[in-house]
Amino acid sequence: MLIWSPKGRAAAGVVASVLFIVFFFLPLAVILMSSLSQQWNGILPSGFTLNHFVNALHGAAWDALLASLTIGFCASLFALLCGVWAALALRQYGVKTQKWLSMVFYLPSAIPSVSVGLGILVAFSQGPLQMNGTLWIVLTAHFVLISAFTFSNVSTGLARISADIENVASSLGASPWYRLRHVTLPLLMPWMMSALALSLSLSMGELGATMMIYPPGWTTLPVAIFSLTDRGNIADGAALTIVLVAITLLLMMKLERIAKRLGQK
């Protein structure tokens, strides 16, 4: 740590705790209370109800949940596949070449998501590859936005795997495909699951690009939440936000648990 004295560490801990409560816990607590409130005209809600959650789990909101899960899993799995392939392929190049080629994957993370959405909308609104108004354009945008994080996680895991392990397998007569399937991928699996969890959480919460390109019938949860709050329906929007946070956290915890279990094998 940068702070060596016990009093300094204690003070830093207090400051960090206060910042966590103010900027993370309190906003979530306010959203939760808003989702349970009948009316909120004062400092605290005047009554509590579950009707907002009932509304959040029926009709269009339920369709938005299914759309978010479908888009999130499909985009994350494709990003994971491409991230693993790219990380494995870049190992064959020198350090300088790896650095420049890696920038291709990291570039989308440096561009605002709205700009990514606009670019994809303009590029694929007419032939020869027209995807505007279809699910594919949303999947493309999510893939572009999350691929950098998937590639980064997988590359980090691959760098921690000793090359001696693969060399031993090769010296024993294992083919490249056998080494990949029985040596490299099993060792890389914990990082792959962590990358999948991170990609899924990012996709589930993506709004900027999705707002510009989503077709009818594929409204995601963030878009549905924005639409509700934009119409002044704060309580239903808050309930849907809690549903989004809960589902995303549960999925991340499950995938991270799988990754931890695989890492212990």
Swiss-Prot record:
Listed A to Z, the keywords are: Cell inner membrane, Cell membrane, Membrane, Transmembrane, Transmembrane helix, Transport
GO cellular component terms, A-Z: plasma membrane
Q: Does the keyword Cell inner membrane apply?
A: yes
Main location per UniProt?
A: membrane
- Membrane topology of the entry: Multi-pass membrane protein
Indicate the transmembrane segments per the record.
Answer: 13-33, 69-89, 104-124, 131-151, 185-205, 233-253
The protein's location, in the record's own words, is: Cell inner membrane
Stored InterPro entries: AminoethylPonate_ABC_PhnV, MetI-like, MetI-like_sf
Induction and repression of expression:
Induced when inorganic phosphate is limiting; this is controlled by PhoB.
Span of domain ABC transmembrane type-1:
65-253
What biological-process terms (Gene Ontology) are attached? transmembrane transport
**Additional comment:** Maps to a phosphate-starvation-inducible locus previously known as psiC.
- What's this protein's family per the entry? Belongs to the binding-protein-dependent transport system permease family.
PANTHER family according to UniProt: INNER MEMBRANE ABC TRANSPORTER PERMEASE PROTEIN YDCV
Q: What is this protein's function per UniProt?
A: Probably part of the PhnSTUV complex (TC 3.A.1.11.5) involved in 2-aminoethylphosphonate import. Probably responsible for the translocation of the substrate across the membrane.
What is the name of this protein?
Putative 2-aminoethylphosphonate transport system permease protein PhnV
Origin organism is Salmonella typhimurium (strain LT2 / SGSC1412 / ATCC 700720)
Q: Gene encoding it?
A: phnV
